[in-house]
Amino acid sequence: MKVTESYLPAITMRNTKPRKLFESFGLAFANWLCLFAVAMLLTLASTKASVVAEAVEDRPSFDLEYGKHIVDLNTVVYCRDGNKIETWTCPVCDKPRIKDFEVDDVIHEFELNIMAFTGYSPSLDAFVFVFRGTKSDDLRNWIIDLSVLELDLDLPYPGSNGAKVHGGFYRTYATTHVRVLVLESWARLRAKYGTDKKVIVTGHSLGGALATFCALDLKLQHNETDLQLYTLGSPRVGNDNFFTFFHNWIGDSIRVVNNYDIVPSLPPTFLGYHHIAREVWSVNTNKTQPDGLPVLNNIVCDDSGEDEHCSDGACLFGICSSIPDHMTYLNIYITCGQPQDNKKHNFESLESFQKK
């Protein structure tokens, strides 16, 4: 097991170097600021829509305990000290659900400050690849998020004609050492633990977008058969054709959205984007459990990726604007802090979250 530092792009692709993220940034940044301002005003000026998705018998059930296991793993990748992740001594590494995790690699790509870790979970009997989400105090990550130029899918995926993806997200995975090091870890894990293990690729926020491309990579380029993508608060990453292409190959995909989280509303559909399925909309019922945490209604949505009875229909024009809702999933705050302090935090903004 090791901590890997990466500085240089690993793959040469036309017009896809990470520094290209800074070109045309002014226009993209201005567009996103306007969009964000409009979303905030619309939400503050109106009452959130009351949306209820009725249970449908042929939809899969939602495993809450399994979901919390995945969320716990996503809290770890926000720890700043890679050595403590490597040795599994970080402040949240001793949570009961994940304390048996065996780390293979901790990956930090310095040019864009992207972080991930990989390893084996005995309790899940699975290889797990976890990608970190956006850090608000790091402008480079926000530049990636704010870049709205779509690119043709450049990896040689069969049948991907017409599939277009978010340029910043795609380049971050495909043109840096992150991709190479993750795939090297996958090979080591198979050599050590066997080739019959399930593979779980997960991430929160920006990490969910990177996890989406990683899952496709493992499926198509490396013939991984038992594969699940499990994202939390992921943005949209591609267009309608990408949605179709993705689900032609990936059958096991869960995309959890918490309440009125702003990030899954972006980039908006009017720019040509379409969410992958299957959404699980985790709604605060405004009731309280005996432990003081909210009672959640975890609604399994349809397989369209854009179920109007789920988060799509919860806010005016489909654009939600809650930052605090982006910081907690399944009643677990996604932060590298004390593992049992959920009730003690009240994050009013992204900035206050980062100070914890």
Task: Give, region by region, the residue ranges found by the protein language model.
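A conserved cap/lid and substrate-binding interface adjacent to the catalytic center
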Residues: 97-202, 220-226, 250-251
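Serine-dependent carboxylesterase/thioesterase catalytic core
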Residues: 181-273
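Catalytic-loop region of hydrolases
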Residues: 71, 77-106
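Short N-terminal segments immediately surrounding and downstream of signal-peptide cleavage
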Residues: 52-72
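N-terminal signal peptide
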Residues: 38-58
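Lipolytic serine-hydrolase domain surface
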Residues: 239-354
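Structured beta-strand/turn binding interfaces of compact recognition modules in eukaryotic regulators
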Residues: 76, 121, 132-134, 232-235, ...
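Classical eukaryotic N-terminal signal peptides for Sec-dependent ER targeting/secretion
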Residues: 1-37
